[in-house]
Amino acid sequence: MGIFYRMFTNNFRTIRSLLLSVLLLSGLLTGCVSSNKLFKMDGDSGTKETLPVHVEVLVEMAEYCNKIYDDGEELGDNEFAYNVVQDRGVTIIIFRGPNNGRNVVTDLDARPFNDRKLSANIHRGFRDAATKLRDEIIENHALEESIILTGHSLGGAVAQIIGLWLEDDAYDVQIYTFGSPAITTASFGDAAIHFRMALRNAPVPLLPPIPYRHWGIAIDPETLTWSENNEIGDFTKIDARDHSIKEYLNILRKHEVTQSQTGR
């Protein structure tokens, strides 16, 4: 069981957690890992010309994620932080986790948890963190009907889970994640809108291992090609530099400049 503490810094709340560490052995992930709910997926894909979201929106979400790092203090291995912005009738919730996301993913309790609200198995450690963050947010903030959730790395993991819960509560939800790990063994094809940015050599999106899987519309920030098929990256070409939120932001800004110059 996780033990959570609360602290307040620089206008955003930090959840400090001591989560049970487990060894990610293949045997631990077998057994009751199949989902009781498999959502239909259309499997659409395309190029930047048919990208189903404006690049300016992706840049804005990346800027929010970058700002929560710049404005906040260094987080410990099992700490998560969030910030809430109210903007013209839309609630924007930004999440972040610790800087060493890859190590923390392997430390968290990775056993699948049968989430009855979603009728699906989700990552137990991410769910524990998301539960505490959701309770904090609901207790301290009035939420609009339209909610955008965004997060980088482990922040993207809790953004997904909380977004799915809020969508189940009839909120109008959109989720934007950058370099997030997988959170479920299910395919939430017809659930909340989720735009998932993942650089091809980033390490954290490759975790945790099968049977966990990604869901949503995967976007390659470098080419702006997109797909609902969520192909896995290559373990042999991992580059830790590709995981920085600043890397995502710099790449997306270049697309924004190119579009303004070409008028597209």
Label each PLM-derived region with a short phrase.
Residues 1-3, 145:
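N-terminal leader/targeting segments
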Residues 5-19:
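Bacterial N-terminal signal peptides that target proteins for export
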Residues 19-30:
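Bacterial N-terminal signal peptides
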Residues 33-150, 154-264:
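Non-catalytic, mobile gating and regulatory segments of ester bond hydrolases
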